[in-house]
Amino acid sequence: MTKYTNADELKSLTLGQKTEYKHTYEPELLQAVPRSLNRDDLALGDELPFVGCDVWTLYELSWLNQNGLPQVAVGEVALPATSPNLVESKSFKLYLNSFNQTKFTSWDEVKETLVKDLSACAGETVKVDIFPVQRYSQQPIVDMQGECIDDQDIIIDDYEFNAAYLESSTSDVNIEETLHSHLLKSNCLITNQPDWGSVEIQYKGKKIDREKLLRYLISFRQHNEFHEQCVERIYTDIMKYCAPESLTVFARYTRRGGLDINPFRSSHLLAPKDNLRLARQ
């Protein structure tokens, strides 16, 4: 359990509660969660050790045009990691549902509305793009970059989070490499529902022991935090124990409620080059 599980800021969230679905535009449905909750737990100050963003894909985005004809689109949203708040995912889903029976004059108006409301919730300007469904029908399914570390003949008998797996995990060999794992699984901070993800780790520095890294990632299996918080924990733990010269951590989670969340944290990159789907997305 994290130190902030019972924080007052979490008690008013609709997540985990029975809610009424609204079908006409209602921006008040959006709920913010202060990023400071887990960053205080990680002893992060105002000067963050990373940059990056949270990339959301919106698969259930629909509204009515001026003639009442339903429109559908796929949206992509990027929330800067520097924003004071993250957007709680169930409230995001409920907010998007409120578009369903609302008339908009154009696709641009929908985009402008999303930018305005999400930026107000996050506390910083949010980037939004919306695309026709046809664009996504042509998008390939890809794998993460680098080598997969999952196929190791090791025994796992501990599934409690333990950053100490990364202690003494580097050698004297300097390397620049990209590794990935599909075994990332954590649980929702509020509901305990499982969150399934894949994570890509790109670094330059002392070579990291792959067995220890995999044991560390598997230790999230019973851990309760939001997606964004897990990725920031992975980033800060690798920096603490492995001290690479540069580091990028990118996780892509399976969708829930028509949304997938893909947190990206880096020592030097503001955003991933592409937003491409994995097999489980």
Curated annotation (Swiss-Prot):
<feature type="binding site">
    <location>
        <begin position="89"/>
        <end position="90"/>
    </location>
    <ligand>
        <name>NADPH</name>
    </ligand>
</feature>
<dbReference type="InterPro" id="IPR029139">
    <property type="entry name" value="QueF_N"/>
</dbReference>
<feature type="binding site">
    <location>
        <begin position="227"/>
        <end position="228"/>
    </location>
    <ligand>
        <name>substrate</name>
    </ligand>
</feature>
<dbReference type="Pfam" id="PF14819">
    <property type="entry name" value="QueF_N"/>
</dbReference>
<keyword id="KW-0521">NADP</keyword>
<feature type="active site" description="Thioimide intermediate">
    <location>
        <position position="188"/>
    </location>
</feature>
<dbReference type="InterPro" id="IPR050084">
    <property type="entry name" value="NADPH_dep_7-cyano-7-deazaG_red"/>
</dbReference>
<dbReference type="GO" id="GO:0006400">
    <property type="term" value="P:tRNA modification"/>
</dbReference>
<feature type="binding site">
    <location>
        <begin position="256"/>
        <end position="257"/>
    </location>
    <ligand>
        <name>NADPH</name>
    </ligand>
</feature>
<dbReference type="Pfam" id="PF14489">
    <property type="entry name" value="QueF"/>
</dbReference>
<protein>
    <recommendedName>
        <fullName>NADPH-dependent 7-cyano-7-deazaguanine reductase</fullName>
        <ecNumber>1.7.1.13</ecNumber>
    </recommendedName>
</protein>
<dbReference type="InterPro" id="IPR029500">
    <property type="entry name" value="QueF"/>
</dbReference>
<comment type="pathway">
    <text>tRNA modification; tRNA-queuosine biosynthesis.</text>
</comment>
<dbReference type="GO" id="GO:0005737">
    <property type="term" value="C:cytoplasm"/>
</dbReference>
<comment type="similarity">
    <text>Belongs to the GTP cyclohydrolase I family. QueF type 2 subfamily.</text>
</comment>
<dbReference type="InterPro" id="IPR016428">
    <property type="entry name" value="QueF_type2"/>
</dbReference>
<keyword id="KW-0963">Cytoplasm</keyword>
<dbReference type="InterPro" id="IPR043133">
    <property type="entry name" value="GTP-CH-I_C/QueF"/>
</dbReference>
<dbReference type="GO" id="GO:0008616">
    <property type="term" value="P:queuosine biosynthetic process"/>
</dbReference>
<feature type="active site" description="Proton donor">
    <location>
        <position position="195"/>
    </location>
</feature>
<dbReference type="GO" id="GO:0033739">
    <property type="term" value="F:preQ1 synthase activity"/>
</dbReference>
<keyword id="KW-0560">Oxidoreductase</keyword>
<keyword id="KW-0671">Queuosine biosynthesis</keyword>
<comment type="subunit">
    <text>Homodimer.</text>
</comment>
<comment type="function">
    <text>Catalyzes the NADPH-dependent reduction of 7-cyano-7-deazaguanine (preQ0) to 7-aminomethyl-7-deazaguanine (preQ1).</text>
</comment>
<feature type="binding site">
    <location>
        <begin position="87"/>
        <end position="89"/>
    </location>
    <ligand>
        <name>substrate</name>
    </ligand>
</feature>
